[in-house]
């Protein structure tokens, strides 16, 4: 009897930690309004940080190259969490502005690529690639192509018809 409470407290701690890793967007959104320390305690150290032009500080949590997610925690000027979201979505990608955005803009939005950067000499374009899911959890690759001046030329989403990691697990 006397051991039940510590056991249940231990189980509750494990379940809460699992929720943060299994449902990071929902967990992060519950922290909105909280300080940076709470976000760091929940998700750990960010993989990258950026000071955005509007004064927002963005923490990137990348699961690349093996995962399919990049999360952004945006903090206001007072250091309070203002938003937490998954960045590798079609909605976020379609906001990219070819001819306007630069490598810096893509990095601030999606983090630096964790897959090898490719250079296509015939196109004279550098490509950054990210793994993502499209509708119905279909594995895909998002690529951003830059000209030699570092300006975004185009973006592309290519669906992985083989099923991503599932086809390689056999």
Task: Show where each model-derived region lies.
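Bacterial signal peptide processing site
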Residues: 20-22
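Short, contiguous, helix-prone interaction/anchoring segments in small proteins
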Residues: 11-13
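C-terminal motif of bacterial Sec signal peptides marking the signal peptidase cleavage site
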Residues: 15-18
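Bacterial N-terminal signal peptides that target proteins for export
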Residues: 1-9
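A cross-family detector of function-defining hotspots
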Residues: 24, 28-80, 98-170
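A short acidic/small-residue loop/turn micro-motif
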Residues: 88-91, 159-161
């Amino acid at each position: 009897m006397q051991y039940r409470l510590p056991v249940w407290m231990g189980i509750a701690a494990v379940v809460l930690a699992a929720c943060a890793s299994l449902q990071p967007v929902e967990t992060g959104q519950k922290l909105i309004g909280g300080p940076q320390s709470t976000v760091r305690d929940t998700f750990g150290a960010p993989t990258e940080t950026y000071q955005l032009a509007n004064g927002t500080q963005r923490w990137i949590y990348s699961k690349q190259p093996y995962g399919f997610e990049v999360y952004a925690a945006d903090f206001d000027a007072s250091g309070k969490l203002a938003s937490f979201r998954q960045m590798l979505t079609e909605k976020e990608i379609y906001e990219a502005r070819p001819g306007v955005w630069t490598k810096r803009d893509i990095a601030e939005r999606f983090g630096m690529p964790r897959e090898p950067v490719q250079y296509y000499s015939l196109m004279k374009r550098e490509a950054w690639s990210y793994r993502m899911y499209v509708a119905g959890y279909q594995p895909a690759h998002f690529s951003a192509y830059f000209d030699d001046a570092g300006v975004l030329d185009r973006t592309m989403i290519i669906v992985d018809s083989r099923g991503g990691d599932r086809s390689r697990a056999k």
